[in-house]
């Protein structure tokens, strides 16, 4: 049996041993390109529910017209990315501008365009060419676009793997373990990603019952 097969078996066994691990489907994504870009570029290294989610909600409320990429980019340039995103530190505002510019160059205007574009094999390398976007954010953009065949490996998923006695040597290995475990559990990789993320987030915050994560 390969090392990966052993790791997948260990992960599935760990999940089956958790009485409070409840499979939950991801919620519907944003129908607003500004929200998608903001969500993806702000989420790294901060608490999603208390930091990112309120800022995305505020952006949708204050900039309802930014449902297309070009209008969102116009707002970023006219009002300033720091004001639009509600974020004034670090490179995240610049990353949001660069991502919007890439999508415009790729003729991605609407959420429908984005959902189609993100599935092209050439799209991920282009995303990774933007400063501030790594493998996790590139995959997270895929999840925001509704892809179900991947997982975005963050600190919560890595910690869950360690709890199962697994120490992946790379992002790609961790992702492969999650994807194979999802097959064993007969759920999509995106659903398993979402469920682990919420389970670990709630456990850290002391919440008893996991729910859904956007």
Q: Could you say what each language-model-derived stretch is?
A:
Residues 1-31, 35, 92-97, 108-111, ...:
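C-terminal accessory module of base-excision DNA glycosylases/AP lyases that mediates lesion recognition
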Residues 1-86:
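Structure-specific DNA junction-binding interface
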């Amino acid at each position: 049996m390969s090392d990966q097969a052993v790791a997948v078996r260990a992960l599935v066994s760990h999940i089956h041993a958790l009485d409070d691990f409840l499979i939950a489907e991801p919620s519907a994504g944003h129908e607003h390109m500004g929200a998608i870009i903001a969500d993806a570029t702000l989420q790294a290294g901060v608490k999603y529910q208390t930091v990112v989610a309120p800022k995305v909600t505020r952006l949708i409320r204050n900039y309802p017209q930014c449902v297309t990429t070009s209008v969102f980019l116009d707002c970023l340039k006219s009002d300033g990315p720091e004001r639009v995103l509600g974020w004034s530190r670090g490179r995240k505002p610049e990353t949001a501008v660069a991502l919007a510019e890439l999508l415009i160059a790729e003729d991605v205007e609407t959420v429908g365009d984005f959902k189609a574009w993100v599935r092209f094999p050439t799209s991920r390398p282009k995303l990774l060419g933007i400063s501030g976007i790594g493998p996790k954010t590139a995959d997270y953009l895929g999840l925001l676009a509704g892809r179900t065949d991947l997982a975005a490996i963050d600190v919560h998923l890595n910690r869950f793997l360690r709890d199962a006695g697994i120490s992946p040597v790379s992002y790609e290995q961790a992702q492969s373990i999650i994807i194979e475990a999802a097959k064993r559990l007969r759920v999509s990789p995106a659903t398993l990603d979402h469920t682990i993320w919420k389970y670990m987030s709630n456990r850290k915050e002391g919440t008893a019952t996991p729910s859904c994560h956007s």
